[in-house]
């Protein structure tokens, strides 16, 4: 197809290969090392929280962009980690032997990543020796636990912000264009990995030096054209290619619909407040973006699943397995299918309640997630006023931090209480629940007896959580436990947590049988089709996908090409819109055609491209390389028509949306004036 690399060029543990330049950025994104000094490219939205954390009204890097002219000006980001996979080992046989040795047979135990990491540490001790500083281990189940792979990784924790475009470039189109093609976003940010002077991973220190990587990507100044071969590497999060028909229905009618309905309420309230005040807009920018991203994904997945009739597609998959089961006398495979279908139906109401609590309270009402004092021992320690003061400063204010706004939370809470109560009534109508829930009863009784204004006033105006002196006084006083327990925020947060535990416990009754049935289902699929014909579902481990640059037909008589240009930015430009405004310098670059050597042969400036590669959440920031392994783009999204690919790959519709690296180079070169970075990059024509 156009690949000019050998297997060892792509993965060659210890020797330096393409895979060594691919990093897991934070907990849910990908990035790539692009220089001999540890420079990392990822998406603007992957670095958004870091950019936001360094922003203020006086120095608004979200709005204006950021560039560090020297190494000394690069900004540290506590809590941000970057990991590089150094070795991948098939650990299936080792795990089986280990489980037999310790007598562990419960899949709910041994399929957990935490348990598997303990097994990985034992493997490392036996095969590599003592665990070295900076080494991180992961072991993950594949094919629902029919295979296990172990990942030896190097983890770096001194990661500094180097450059970021203004949001009018990095987030152009914002939520309106999210999941959409054609697209015109310069969705990138630049960081650098630092190490101790000896090259080992280290916490932030002024003495640290830029990483000297085993391998880094050269950057193609030539770019790509329609039909060209491309390959992508990254850490995709979750896919569900082996859903049964009932699981498809559950995803659409329960999971997605509840997420869509409740996030819409939250987002509309947040947006109204964000548009009133620039400071609030900065505070809630990342929260809003995170919410809308999953919201639009749910809408797109449901649309695709219905349009492509995924339920029927999965029925065909199941029918093939049932026929195989009958032909080869393998009744366990038919039994597994029947168990899955039955359990999905039985757990429907509990599943709906879990999603309502998660989307409507836990993720939406910030006071519902407030830190609690949950033991007598902890309370006894906090009787000391000094300890209580320290707990308030570090824990309470650590949660209700600079990105929290009480008035925004007040308005969101009012909207969510109403929406959640209505939703619970709807999904439980005519049913006698096997569990008792505290929060809905308490909130309803509270609202009916006191009224909405007084209830919200009690939470946000009277709670000791928002008054340090009162909190310390209560905690350090005799009998303070009672006053603390009766505080409105304590009551809300405690009841929500207890209800979620109750629901989770009831749902967990299905977990073991469900996990075993899923494993048997996949065992049958592997036996029937062979491992080389089935890719395992994504699980945040390093994966490769290949394809070509290619447009698509989204509907009758409409064709979307594979490349967009700055012409499209100017067509969408609207300074009255917070999503499509442009800073004057961007307009000047376009009007003066100041594109340098990054323009297409026809003089137009490339911005985004699409490819047939198969991606999902976690692939944000993934490097797109040509057949020679040179960086040609950075993945940042998928198209609306292809979002359902998490359940069933759609080659005619599904496209990865990618930042053309030539637009990134233009922004660094012409907008940010990042001369030292341009010299640092290895740009090939």
Where are these regions (language model features)?
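Terminal presequence/propeptide segments associated with secretion/organelle targeting
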Residues: 1-685
